Amino acid sequence: VGSEMCIRDSLPAGAQLYQPGEVLDYRASYKAKFFPNTEVGSVRVTTVEEEYEGEPMYRIVAHGKTLPAFRWVMNVDDKYTILVDREELKTRRFESDIREGNYRFWSNYVYDWPEMTVHTRWQGRRMVRDTTKTMSLTPRSMDPVSLYFHLRSIDPATLQEGKTEVLEMLLEDTIRHLRYRFLGRETKKIRSMGTFRTLKFACQIGTSEGYSFTDGTEFTVWISDDKNLIPLYIESPVRIGSVQAYISGYHGLKYPLSSKIK
């Protein structure tokens, strides 16, 4: 009972933002010193209601792919899916299907919240058979898609500039720490979309043993400063240059996008 209460207390305060019919479109771009900022990919995040094994669920799918003009360089077609219990608002399943050039990878996580465990299964292109592992959960353990929605659940009234929070990101056979820090409010211009009031966060990913940060694991997120709390812009450095993802379209939002200034 205590663990269930703890789980409920840790649930996203704005978890009602699992909004059926919501569609968020993003464009991904790359830029470097001698390489202009160029759009190379797209991502669509959708939320629908469905029944799974007789239970009401939200199905959230994030589907990213390379734009046609760049598929000859690297043909990316990645899909991530979560099923969320509509009553308890806890993720029940996570699946990934990653196709990047000749690389293939598949994974599946099944959450057992009463036992506070997660059963993971994964297989790569060169693996003869899939691999499995069972790991312990805490109320702060989440897969990457669930983390995306957790950031949307933050209550802006409780934010303190410089304050750090730590979550746990599940990755097949390990759990990595995700540390995020509120940097303050900022007006952000988004290409072809306009200017928005945003909440700015710095995020870092470490190992399960601690914060052993390497190049590319630190990134910045700008979230709309309104009731929708949409990630509007993400920027991450890479070895040469940086990659960005920014909102390019939306519909089916639960609330007006009041953060848009012009």
How should each PLM-predicted stretch be described?
Residues 8-111, 156-262:
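Acidic, serine/threonine-rich low-complexity disordered tracts
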Residues 113-171:
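Active-site/ligand-binding surface loops and adjacent short beta/alpha elements
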Residues 1-7:
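Short, small-residue-biased leader/transition segments that mark boundaries at the very start
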Residues 4, 88, 115-117:
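Structural motif
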